[in-house]
Amino acid sequence: MKDIVFYNSLTREKEVFKPINANEVGMYSCGPTVYNYAHIGNFRAYIFSDLLRRVLEDYGYNVKLVMNLTDVDDKTIKNSKENHISLNDYTKKYKEAFFEDIKTLGIKKATVNPAATDHIKEMINIIELLKKNGHTYESDGSVYFKISTFPQYGELANLDKQELLDGASGRVLNDEYDKENASDFVLWKAYTEDDGDVYWDSPFGKGRPGWHIECSAMSCKYLGKHFDIHTGGVDNKFPHHENEIAQNEAAFNEKFVNYWLHCEHLIVDGEKMSKSKGNFYTLRDLLDKGLSPEAIRYSLINSHYRKQLNFTIEGIKQSQSAIDRVNDLIFRLKDINNTESNEINENLLKELEVSNEKFSDSIYNDLNISEALGILFTLVKTVNTSFDSINVNTRDAILKFIERVNNIINCFNMGDTDKKSNNEDEDKINKLIEERTIAKKEKNYQKADEIRNQLLSMGIEIMDTPQGVKWKRK
């Protein structure tokens, strides 16, 4: 069987994937900071993680995915105070919204979704280990990681070691900062009045954890000290992931993660997302524009994860057209009842076998999804050209291949009407179709057109075929 190859951000090379345990993959993905609704750039990272998981499952692995919820940090505390509401009540709303959104986008729920506030004890334990191993110091009641005690610091983000040494005397209390300000980072923040009632007692005094120690503690608890894959957006690479490596490897004296995978930034209409520019979108904003979740997902998935994605409304509409082409073929294939065998079917089956192999080659080569989709649509074109000659055996083989693709893409309608948001009663649909048929027989074409338009407004598309009227959900 062909190897899976991933680009490892740590080594900056493509590497054959070899899990620690033969049939299982331990995977950690940085989840949302629940201070607001997730925006479309966040969802690119979450859909990338979902794609990776589905490809690993396609290969035959059992995947244990851990995706955290950051429910205590600078932003969550600031926003909860501004809204005069407790941290727990404030973040609860956005936790629930996140789970609603990933369900809407067809993202599989993680095996575990640990919340930071439920794992303070584990964070304190790691900080105590780091202190014991000589990697920390205290200042003004806060505990910092001294990066000069960890020689490998900066390898993931490819920091200049000499510049790092020259500037390593500083320290930073903020959770987020850039490479130019690489400094000793905070593990435990001393309580200040700005924190309100958000604090925990610890051996270091009253306070709260830094952002970076949160993921270290939760990944360790659910995946162990050493696991296979860690993912996130490229903006997480530094300082967050760099600091995670330092914390875990300095605490436990062993390798933390074997493969680091990062997806690139998303821009909108060629520019960075900004509320002032009017190009800042949450999922809910896009749904309010009448765009389908499947088309949004397809738009976020159809470019290679290591390439910057230019997200546009026009692009979503093109994605919908691509989805409709496949859905239309699925719909028509299911009506085939021809049992005759012929040369066209034999050739199609051979081409299908080649397409399946090429699809594997693409997705197992660092998730080359754009190439994989190209293979699918080449086959769709071929099938449409030969459609009238296809028999049931070839039909079943084609549908099996499309179903395999969809288990990874999860954008097409394989016949599960519950997948669509339109849940109009089927009896009502069939009754309207019957009324339209009668109207046509009576040559009342105006009424027939009115019924067709009524069905369209319900999200139902009808087709007149030699076998009778067929309908599908748009």
Curated annotation (Swiss-Prot):
Primary enzyme class: ligase
Q: Which superkingdom?
A: Bacteria
Protein's recorded name: Cysteine--tRNA ligase
Its subunit composition reads:
Monomer.
Primary location recorded for the protein, binned into one broad class: cytoplasm
Provide the GO biological process annotations: cysteinyl-tRNA aminoacylation
Q: What is the UniProt remark on how the cofactor binds and its stoichiometry?
A: Binds 1 zinc ion per subunit.
Annotated ATP binding sites: 275
Its subcellular locations are: Cytoplasm
The protein's gene is named cysS
Entry-linked InterPro entries? Cys-tRNA-ligase, Cys-tRNA/MSH_ligase, CysS_C, Rossmann-like_a/b/a_fold, tRNA-synt_1_cat_dom, tRNAsynth_Ia_anticodon-bd
Cite a single Pfam family from the UniProt record: CysS_C
Which cofactors?
Answer: Zn(2+)
HAMAP family from the UniProt entry: Cys_tRNA_synth
Per the Swiss-Prot or TrEMBL record, what residue ranges does the short sequence motif 'HIGH' region cover? 32-42
> Which Enzyme Commission number(s) are on file for it?
6.1.1.16
Residues binding Zn(2+) are 30, 215, 240, 244
Report motif location: 'KMSKS' region.
272-276
> Which family is this sequence assigned to?
Belongs to the class-I aminoacyl-tRNA synthetase family.
- Give one GO molecular function term: zinc ion binding
* CC per GO annotation: cytosol
Q: Which UniProt keywords apply?
A: Aminoacyl-tRNA synthetase, ATP-binding, Cytoplasm, Ligase, Metal-binding, Nucleotide-binding, Protein biosynthesis, Zinc
Taxonomically, what lineage is the organism?
A: Bacteria, Pseudomonadati, Spirochaetota, Spirochaetia, Brachyspirales
Q: Which reaction does it catalyse?
A: tRNA(Cys) + L-cysteine + ATP = L-cysteinyl-tRNA(Cys) + AMP + diphosphate
